[in-house]
């Protein structure tokens, strides 16, 4: 395994491998009935999200080929409560996929550092992992907060009508 990882690690393998590991890891978490523990976390607030450039990165994702990877995360049509709740659930699943992928991949990077890969490789792989996994976690959390605001506004309007 050591030889395979140290000789075959490249950025494309990193990104798509971590996505795959994230999907499997999240599936295992769902099967273990511990998924509820991962549903409503906010690791950073809106101000830091903006300062880190996560929203600009989100624009880049939406306007590049990467935006094609998860069509379930696009809201189309008229705004209604059920669609927003489903979109939030899909975003939570995607967020957890990226979080699990980030943790597993960063663990592999640290393991490879102990195995003797160059420091520039550790730094490069870590930056790639942060951008393509952790930033996507932050982006999903930001979007979920926006959905929560819309849902609470709709609920308040419904209470006023009643």
Residue ranges and their predicted role:
Residues 79-101:
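Loop-to-transmembrane boundary segments
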Residues 100-145:
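Hydrophobic transmembrane alpha-helices
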Residues 1-42, 97-115:
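Long, highly hydrophobic alpha-helical transmembrane signal-anchor segments
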Residues 20-21, 87, 143:
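Generic structural hydrophobic/aromatic packing signal, biased to beta-strands
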Residues 2, 6-14, 85, 89, ...:
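Alpha-helical transmembrane segments of integral membrane proteins
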């Amino acid at each position: 395994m050591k030889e395979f990882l140290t000789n075959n690690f490249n950025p494309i393998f990193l990104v798509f491998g971590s996505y795959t590991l994230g999907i499997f890891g999240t599936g295992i978490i769902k099967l273990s009935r511990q998924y509820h523990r991962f549903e409503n976390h906010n690791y950073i607030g809106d101000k830091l999200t903006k300062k880190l450039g996560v929203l600009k990165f989100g624009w880049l994702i939406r306007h590049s080929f990467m935006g094609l990877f998860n069509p379930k995360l696009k809201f189309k049509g008229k705004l209604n409560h059920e669609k927003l709740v489903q979109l939030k659930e899909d975003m939570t699943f995607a967020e957890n996929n990226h979080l699990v992928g980030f943790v597993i991949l960063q663990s592999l990077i640290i393991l490879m550092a102990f195995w003797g890969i160059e420091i520039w490789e550790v730094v490069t792989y870590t930056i790639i992992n942060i951008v393509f996994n952790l930033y996507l976690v932050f982006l999903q959390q930001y979007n979920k907060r926006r959905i929560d605001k819309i849902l609470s506004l709709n609920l308040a309007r419904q209470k006023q009508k009643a």
